[in-house]
Amino acid sequence: MPERWTRDTWRKKPILQVPEYPDKAALAAVEGQLASFPPLVFAGEARNLKKALGRVALGEGFLLQGGDCAESFSEPSANNVSANNIRDFLRVFLQMAVVLTYAAALPVVKVGRIAGQFAKPRSSPTEKKDGKELPSYRGDIINGVEFDEAARRPDPARLVEAFRHSAATLNLLRAFVHGGYANLANVRQWTLGFVKDSPQSHHYEELADRISEALGFMQACGLDLESHPELKSTDFYTSHEALLLGYEQAMTREDSTRPGTWCCTSAHMLWIGDRTRQPDHAHVEFCRGIMNPLGIKCGPSSKNDELLRLLDILNPENEPGRITLICRLGADKVGDQLPGMVRAVEREGKLVVWSCDPMHGNTITSDTGYKTRPFDRILSEVKTFFAVHRAEGTHGGGVHLEMTGQNVAECTGGARMITDADFKDRYHTVCDPRLNAEQSIDLAFLLAELLKAERTTKARPLPAAAGL
């Protein structure tokens, strides 16, 4: 029998990827302050997301999850307004969701890596530059990106700043998705100016025309579109990696409608990273006791027996929608490793959402020294992921992307054929390279073709047997 869970039982377990704070008393005071703050999300919203993901796990939906690699307290470009960046991200995200919904004829569950993605695991605890060694940048919630001793010192006050930024971002997102901006009648207005000249823009315009015609037909038939909230707004959920557990513990509250149930109110969904998914460690211990839907990042080092053990710990009731397996294997390894993983999970009857993260396994260093991700490798992993699920008879249920609504140049390739030469003026990420708006929409149309082909295959009647 596992030990009775409380919000702080994780503190008795081994832990990785958490910084050493010089002032423990200051950290404890900040965590106490956070515990008195209002929740960012509500348990009922997390339950709604879990229900929607449960339908995805059963093959009745698709998960679109994406956003910044790491959010920043200050925008990387001084002339960018934060509100505009949030709006532009949402515009691209809504475009992608419309493309996928239309192609798959399935509801698309929309989950952003936003309003809380401020902490990042690192492969090395220190970073060297010009002969000087300092602690690695671990995200704005922990320390600063500037390469100096003061900035790189973990600062507890940053936890409060992260809460405030998350609250402001979430408030703006709620206003956009429920205040009319996400109205399907605005489908044409979501296109960003610099995307209008892109090779995929005419495909999106054609799709927008078909949607507008369908809405016009429905109105002509007497349907009052204003009385259907599902056409005027959408459900949009937030997520981030559950990495800085002191922050997550402070944001965990008992569900007032279901005593004894605990919800981490920093986001609707949390995930456990590839570097922190050890079954007997702190991050798994914390996550097993909260009711939020959870993701598990599965990289090349993931072993099937360990994965099954994680599923037993984190989802002992085998609840649909509780677990999303976010596979980040790389274009070269996904075809070899994913089939065995799928078979192991299916053999045990585990209900999960299978999601493809084609970003993290395809990171390289360019000739000019920039960290980048070739777009063709990203596409290759996505194609192989869905091909494996088609071959195994399982549902490839989603994608998990690092992306932005900005006109950056961080991933090479795509319709505009971005190269190293473009990085000099348009490389703005504080951590890992992201798909820009055009590349994100390019990927959505590729996914649309894969989902449409899958839908056609499922709908095609089997040939009648001879003699029947």
Give the predicted meaning of each segment.
Residues 33-36, 43, 56-92:
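N-terminal ordered "arm"
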Residues 66, 312, 343-345:
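Short beta-strand elements
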Residues 52-56, 99-101, 286-287, 388-392:
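A general structural signal for short secondary-structure junctions and capping/turn motifs
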